């Protein structure tokens, strides 16, 4: 558990939170795929003596574009507790709106990641997309590593049989009432059950 955990609402970080290990994603309903990512980040934290930060978005971009309700698996307070348990030092909870959605993938890398965050390592999953019209991906991030001084870390996805463990997979199983599978995939099963009850 981390002491002095900090929550930012924009990318203006304090000096001590720059040049950190950065994880980018929604991290909705912490599952075992997320846990694999956090475990890897924790090993980097110990090895390189760096802080861990998470960049996440509110609302989840898919909720914003498709005007979805009752989509989240975790509320904000639940996310914070799960981050703290995984030795995250700070988060950037960026408001996702029309203005932010118009930022190009190149501007996101240069003006936000490079100019403001200055990460040493960026942890992302295979399906990560960013920038206007989701034009940016992990391939683009990797191609600009040397230009902007970061290193992309992309752990292989965790699978259950042929399925990648993801928030989408958990949602589908919740909708079908497959609670045994939800419990198997999820790190935050208690949170999910409590939150699911509140949704209906």
Model regions and ranges:
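Short helix-adjacent coil turns
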Residues: 174-181
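Extended, well-folded interaction surfaces typified by the phenylalanyl-tRNA synthetase beta subunit core
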Residues: 165-170
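Divalent metal-coordination and catalytic microenvironments
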Residues: 31, 122, 182
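Conserved small/polar residues in nucleotide/adenosyl-binding loops
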Residues: 190-197
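N-terminal catalytic cores of NTP/NDP-binding nucleotidyl/phosphoryl-transfer enzymes
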Residues: 11-75
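N-terminal Rossmann-like or analogous alpha/beta NTP/dinucleotide-binding catalytic cores
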Residues: 63-126, 130-148
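A short, charged helix-loop
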Residues: 147-158
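Short acidic-hydrophobic, aromatic-tinged amphipathic segments that line or gate anion-handling sites
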Residues: 4-11
